[in-house]
A protein has these predicted regions:
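ATP-binding N-terminal substructure of ATP-dependent carboxylate-amine bond-forming enzymes
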Residues: 1-102, 136
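Preference for protein termini
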Residues: 1-32, 66-77, 131, 173-179, ...
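Short, charged, surface-exposed secondary-structure boundary motifs
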Residues: 40-42, 58-60, 105-112, 161-163, ...
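ATP-dependent carboxylate activation and anion-phosphoryl transfer catalytic cores
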Residues: 68, 234-237, 241-336
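Active-site nucleotide/adenylate-binding loops and adjacent lid/helix of ATP-dependent enzymes
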Residues: 106-203, 232
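Phosphate-binding site of ATP-dependent enzymes
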Residues: 177-254, 258-259, 269-277
Length: 336
């Protein structure tokens, strides 16, 4: 019997390291990636390189899983590719984790605009905004709302903080090139840059939320939260990890709404009055999932062992704990 983690984010390594000591010796751990990433795949018992083409990859995964008696396939970053083929995996006796239980929920999670609309309809506090598709629309939306709100912008489709910028008027236009990690850009420079694109991607202009930011990593099963760790992201770059917090209760409502399944991550931020608003749910493990191990609550093990129908070992958890992310390195072998 085996468990297979397909290509994910960089946190695929953290998941493999969390799983290996918790699996019985007769459960083989497999990993794969489209690129040569030995620092990730060497953490598994067996590793493969995935085909580049999506359609080819799905059939290759299904065939390979059957050949090696793999009972659980975790789709990683490409849940939308595998979800339409769930019935084929189930027919082969293989459990499939994609982040949700149907393709439409995955598509709605991927669209910040549709995600916000569904949350609003369900009465869930969410960071909503205005979709723009060209420079003229962007300029009009900014002009209509800049007096009432500090504004920010991000792609309608994207993961985590990719493409997020705050719109600031009283700022040197060149500052965004000197300190890009500040994520601040002059309003006019952004409008000019967006207008210059021949095929601009849809963007979401939103009121900027100035309050505390949280991230919640969760084990979910068909819309039910099984275990969760909330991470309070502090200004000094440290994070406070908690097993109990009101933002987890907020996350439960969103998970139920979108029938989340597997390990997913919710991001939220407070407004000036302290009210938390959901920013997004990423239907895959976050880049910070490895930090949660400092609580001794092994989310990866809980997720996989429950799927395999195996008992969960007792975990001597700690909460709250404070961590600070570091940059480190590992030796890797060269490609053959």
């Amino acid at each position: 019997m085996g468990v297979w983690l397909l290509e994910g984010q960089s946190s695929q390594r953290d998941l493999l390291q969390a799983l290996r000591p918790m699996l019985p010796p007769d459960i083989a751990l497999y990993a794969s990636h489209r690129k040569f990433r030995p620092e990730i795949t060497d953490c598994a018992d067996h590793a493969w390189q995935e085909p580049a083409d999506d359609a080819e990859r799905v059939h290759w995964v299904l065939d390979t899983a059957q050949q090696h008696q793999i009972k659980l396939v975790w789709a990683g970053r490409r849940g939308q590719v595998y979800e339409p083929h769930r019935a084929a995996f189930v027919a082969a006796g293989i459990d499939l984790i994609t982040g949700a239980t149907c393709l439409q929920d995955l598509l709605d999670l991927d669209s910040k605009a549709i995600f916000a609309e569904r949350c609003e309809q369900a009465g869930i506090p969410v960071a909503s905004g205005w979709v723009v598709e060209n420079g003229v629309q962007l300029a009009e939306v900014v002009a209509a709302h800049r007096e009432q709100h500090a504004l920010c912008i991000k792609p309608v489709h994207g993961i985590f903080g990719e493409g997020f910028w705050r719109l600031i008027d009283d700022l040197s236009p060149f500052r965004c090139f000197l300190t890009p990690d500040d994520r601040r850009v002059t309003t006019q420079l952004l409008i000019d840059s967006y207008s210059a694109q021949t095929e601009p991607k849809p963007m979401l202009v939103m009121p900027y939320l100035s309050g505390q930011e949280y991230s919640v990593d969760m084990v979910c099963e068909a819309g039910q939260v099984i275990a969760a760790v909330a991470r309070d992201k502090r200004e000094d770059k440290s994070q406070c990890l908690m097993l109990e917090h009101e933002v987890i209760e907020l996350a439960r409502r969103v998970v139920a709404l979108f029938n989340c399944d597997g390990i997913v991550n919710l991001q939220s931020k407070a407004d000036a009055h302290g009210q938390q608003h959901v920013l997004e749910i990423n239907a895959r493990p976050s880049g910070g999932i490895g930090y949660t191990m400092h609580t001794s609550l092994n989310l990866a093990a809980i997720c996989v062992l429950r799927r395999l129908g195996m008992p969960i070992p007792e975990m001597q958890t700690q909460s709250p704990v404070i961590v600070r992310p570091l940059t480190s390195s590992v030796l890797i072998r060269e490609a053959l």
